[in-house]
């Protein structure tokens, strides 16, 4: 990109202007986020605090897939975990605390409401042994992997002869 020195006005200090670069403009347009203004306080929802959406940590060990979510203030009776095929879903709600009309808040940034998250799992989850534990506001899902399936060798018999011998792996 070339810079041009252009003398403007009556002063003696030259001002620099940029030559138009279509590639630079294309890069700026690619980096532009049309929803950026939605996060501006002017457009914010003034009805109340944002919705409660817990963040998850998902990791894999040799034996299982481990999901962890911070759910402070959520009671275990308000959490539902379902496993359907290759999909695990976690949903629940965090209730708003009752407020007295005489109370005056200077800040109210806590979030409440219902949430639902779903994750697609790789093959091999042992759905019969899934565990869900809530301790100190942290939900831990343990989805164990099925034992590796060992291949079974099948003897190929020639046509017209009976297969009498079974070979075990």
Curated annotation (Swiss-Prot):
Protein encoded by which gene: hspA
Limits of the sHSP domain: 47-159
Annotated spans, Disordered: 1-21, 150-169
UniProt KW Hydrolase keyword: no
UniProt KW keywords: Sporulation, Stress response
Residues spanning the membrane: none
GO term, biological process aspect, one: sporulation resulting in formation of a cellular spore
Stated role: May stabilize cellular components during stress and spore formation.
Pfam family, one: HSP20
Descriptive protein name: Spore protein SP21
PANTHER family: HEAT-SHOCK PROTEIN 20 FAMILY MEMBER
Family: Belongs to the small heat shock protein (HSP20) family.
Gene3D superfamilies in the record: 2.60.40.790
Swiss-Prot/TrEMBL induction comment: By stress, such as heat shock and oxygen limitation.
Lineage of the organism: Bacteria, Pseudomonadati, Myxococcota, Myxococcia, Myxococcales
InterPro entries attached to this UniProt entry: A-crystallin/Hsp20_dom, HSP20-like_chaperone, Small_HSP
Keyword NAD in annotation: no
